[in-house]
């Protein structure tokens, strides 16, 4: 991997922190290509997806192993168009597998950060849920999301600017009920995601264009992190309470809870909060600096969360710890 002159070399990548992203940055082609070229990752993907496939069989979904790792893997569009929950199980399995491969190469992480859907993979990686139960919860969430109409739009601006855009677009609600559009996720000082009805998001995107602020509708057919989704959140929490939990092998910090999870947390309720409460990434990134990490790794297929981590940490530390998105870096030293 090409290192900046100020960056520590891989042999100093101690006490790593693993970052588990949400659903907005999943690339099945990157997963497939990396699994074919990286033996350690390929082994981890086989092992994890084999366990996930006990759940696909149980719940009537297509088996992921032969599909993802076979001679004709699906496109992202084909995966998204498959039975409800298929893409979420693929993302969940990919994140847990990347975590395992990274742990084999660089040691068990000192901590993990879970962002939205990524909390399920983070808790599973820490041993709180088994892979099978984590996959069941991922499918439960996918089913809950079918009752979450609307969409999500990424804005290239600060949280303050995003809130100003919502006011300009006239989509902040009247105070008589849930607001139309809300700030759903704060990734860093220059990246925010808003959630709400599709028509209202179009107004926000128009206001953003008028201000020359980048706006991109995420390719996700649902809303999330919105206070109007309470019913879906309660249904999801009920489903998750059926799964046993164990003590975490390492600390897991939640971008929605804004803190480290503890042994007395009602995890079903906290995971359901991901449907109705906003996520803020910068505070939990700053929290995990307490573990003195030499490196932060994105445990997913993309690089958006790693990019946000670089932005946040560079503003706070000089030098900041290294941050890498292994599957997005062809020369990453596995």
Q: Can you name each region flagged by the protein language model?
A:
Residues 2-168, 172-176, 214, 218-220, ...:
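FabD-like malonyl-/acyl-CoA
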Residues 149, 185-193, 219-222, 247-248:
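Short Gly/Ser/Thr- and Asp/Glu-enriched loop/turn motifs at secondary-structure junctions
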Residues 179-184:
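A short linear hydrophobic-aromatic micro-motif
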Residues 213-299, 303, 307:
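Acyltransferase
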Residues 173-176, 210-211, 243-245, 313-319:
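Short helix-capping segments at alpha-helix termini
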Residues 166-170, 201-211:
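Short amphipathic alpha-helices in soluble, non-transmembrane regions
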Residues 159, 196-201:
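Helix N-cap motif at beta-to-alpha junctions
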């Amino acid at each position: 991997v090409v290192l900046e002159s100020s960056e520590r070399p891989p042999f100093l990548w101690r006490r790593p922190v693993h970052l588990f992203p949400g659903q907005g940055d999943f690339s099945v082609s990157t997963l497939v290509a990396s699994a074919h070229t990286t033996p350690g990752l390929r082994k981890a993907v086989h092992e994890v997806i084999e366990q996930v496939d006990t759940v696909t069989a149980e719940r009537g979904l297509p088996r992921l192993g032969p599909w993802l790792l076979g001679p004709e893997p699906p496109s992202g569009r084909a995966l998204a168009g498959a039975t409800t929950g298929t893409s979420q199980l693929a993302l969940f399995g990919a994140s847990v597998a990347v975590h395992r491969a990274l742990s084999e190469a660089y040691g068990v992480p000192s901590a993990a950060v879970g962002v939205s859907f990524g909390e399920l993979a983070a808790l599973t990686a820490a041993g709180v849920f088994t892979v099978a139960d984590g996959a069941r919860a991922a499918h439960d969430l996918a089913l809950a999301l079918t009752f979450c109409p609307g969409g999500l739009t990424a804005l290239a601006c600060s949280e303050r600017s995003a809130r100003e855009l919502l006011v300009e677009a006239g989509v902040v609600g009247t105070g008589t009920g849930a607001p139309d559009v809300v700030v759903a996720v704060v990734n860093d000082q220059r990246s925010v995601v808003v959630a709400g009805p599709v028509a209202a998001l179009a107004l926000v995107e128009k206001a953003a264009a008028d201000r020359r602020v980048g706006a991109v509708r995420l390719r996700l057919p649902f809303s999330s992190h919105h206070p109007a989704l309470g019913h879906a959140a309660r249904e999801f929490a009920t489903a998750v309470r059926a799964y046993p939990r164990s003590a975490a092998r390492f600390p897991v910090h939640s971008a929605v809870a804004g803190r480290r999870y503890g042994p007395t947390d009602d995890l079903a309720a906290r995971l359901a909060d991901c449907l109705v409460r906003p996520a803020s990434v910068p505070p939990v990134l700053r929290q995990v600096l307490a573990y003195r990490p030499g490196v932060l790794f994105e445990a997913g297929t993309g690089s958006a969360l790693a990019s946000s981590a670089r932005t946040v940490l560079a503003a706070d530390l000089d030098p900041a710890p290294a941050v890498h998105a292994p599957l997005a870096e062809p020369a990453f030293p596995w």
